[in-house]
From Swiss-Prot:
Ligand binding (5-aminolevulinate 2): S372, Y411
Residues that bind 5-aminolevulinate 1: R303, K315
BP GO terms, sorted: chlorophyll biosynthetic process; heme biosynthetic process; protoporphyrinogen IX biosynthetic process
Location in or out of the cell: Plastid, Chloroplast
Protein role: Catalyzes an early step in the biosynthesis of tetrapyrroles. Binds two molecules of 5-aminolevulinate per subunit, each at a distinct site, and catalyzes their condensation to form porphobilinogen.
Key words of the record: Allosteric enzyme, Chlorophyll biosynthesis, Chloroplast, Heme biosynthesis, Lyase, Magnesium, Metal-binding, Plastid, Porphyrin biosynthesis, Transit peptide
Molecular function (Gene Ontology), one example: porphobilinogen synthase activity
Active-site positions on this chain: K293 (schiff-base intermediate with substrate), K346 (schiff-base intermediate with substrate)
Cofactor(s) listed: Mg(2+)
Catalytic activity of the protein: 2 5-aminolevulinate = porphobilinogen + 2 H2O + H(+)
Keyword Metal-binding recorded: yes
Protein name: Delta-aminolevulinic acid dehydratase, chloroplastic
Textual note on the cofactor: Binds 2 magnesium ions per monomer. The first magnesium ion is required for catalysis. The second functions as allosteric activator.
Amino acid sequence: MASTVSFSPANVQMLQGRSCHGHAAFGGCSAVPRTGPRMRSVAVRVSSEQEAAPAVRAPSGRTIEECEADAVAGRFPAPPPLVRPKAPEGTPQIRPLDLTKRPRRNRRSPALRAAFQETTISPANLVLPLFIHEGEDDAPIGAMPGCYRLGWRHGLLDEVYKSRDVGVNSFVLFPKVPDALKSQSGDEAYNDNGLVPRTIRLLKDKFPDIVVYTDVALDPYSSDGHDGIVREDGVIMNDETVYQLCKQAVSQARAGADVVSPSDMMDGRVGAIRAALDAEGFHDVSIMSYTAKYASSFYGPFREALDSNPRFGDKKTYQMNPANYREALLETAADEAEGADILLVKPGLPYLDVIRLLRDNSALPIAAYQVSGEYSMIKAGGALNMIDEEKVMMESLMCLRRAGADIILTYFARQAANVLCGMRSN
């Protein structure tokens, strides 16, 4: 006989395509539904042997009908004997502990562990930092294996294509600016035809649905390598720097940035940038403030990537002291009052306590930046076979989420999303 089965070529395509169910412990990426031609029917020949299939029998050898008859009559088979696994030789014979609560009961199987998992992670939680430069070719970054200064057109677009394929739709831009364009006042930062505005326009033209974050700071544009204008006595000028940052943020918003991210740590810059954006009509452009940015030693590879090391001194007069905890509350209160939409902690893993502090004291979304030093340490450990790179990568991201981060800026974003989608991580 012939049976009629309804199907669609689109459905067949989805079944044959890559599975994206995700890593069991972390969550998964969302598949994009496909559309196809309307449903049609096909006749499928079923053989006579299939029509006359033998009766289904229970493990005992009886048919289903016989089992049902026994159940109606109240005759139930005896349960199999409970066989306890043997303990190894030499295990002491003891009376079980008189415990009412045994937390291990909820961990004894993968299904139970998944049911009670408190924290999850998905590609939607990840923001991929992108290093860009004026050249056409991608240039590898020696201190950050797997990362490149991307050619601002071809290499950049290819990286975004690949990231979107695994569910990463948020990106933050960091430019390597030619020395010839750097100055003490960092005027190139608000050039509407500069590298960052051009890149924003390119990305928004090709991928209008992505979220573009931008960095608001003068260090990539400063001949001194600092986040602000440097006075002749070496003091970083706060208010004059904020004035420049406002122009930079407006230029980025004009190009199409979704979120501007002041990382400079100047006092009062969030409120000033909010006022400047609103005055230009950019009421819907968000501000992600680097609220608790510490003067950390974990930034080394990043500064190599952008050639943005300070020409003298350090950044301790404006970035936070790594020994301080409560000070983060002062910065949080100020940024909230000035109109920040997202609060960020940088670095990430060494400052889990600060992430939790902000999470417990603010209703705003919390971001964590897993910085270049954190990334490079995991990469180096994996390359030397001292750790399992993939497992440590995923655990580190889960820890940031567990501490309270809603989103994570990480150079592992695409690699981690591959894992979440059940693909190879490299």
